[in-house]
Structures are given as C-alpha cells and as structure tokens.
Design a protein with these regions (language model features):
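Conserved structural position within tetratricopeptide repeats
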Residues: 32-33
Length: 61
C-alpha cells in the first residue's frame, strides 16, 4: 500500500495539515513526477506554491 498514490497523497496531506509545507511540497512534487495527471496532487501543489510565494505555472493544468 505505501507505494500507492492514494497513500502518498494522505502522507503529504498530513504534513500539509501540520503546516510543514516544505515537506508536503516535496512529497506532492514526487507524486507529480510519477503521476502528472493526478488532479488532487496538482491542486495541492498549486495551493502550496501560492502559500510559499513560489512559481507554480509548470503545474497548472
């Protein structure tokens, strides 16, 4: 199960809720590299980038 996308999304979500945005961003980026079509991942990637004031255009679908 830990290799499943859903599992990784839950882990990233936990870090996001703990306000560890850097760790969360790293995990979402890893998910994006493996699954660029995952809309949940894309949505949170853009959201975190906006919060951190970093460019997010490459993730816009």
């Amino acid at each position: 199960q830990p290799k499943e996308v859903k599992w990784k999304l839950m882990v990233a979500s936990c870090y996001r809720r703990m306000n560890d945005l850097d760790k969360s961003l790293k995990i979402y980026e890893e998910i994006y590299q493996e699954n660029p079509e995952n809309l949940e991942c894309l949505r949170f990637l853009v959201q975190i980038c906006q919060q951190l004031n970093i460019p997010y255009e490459e993730y816009n679908a």
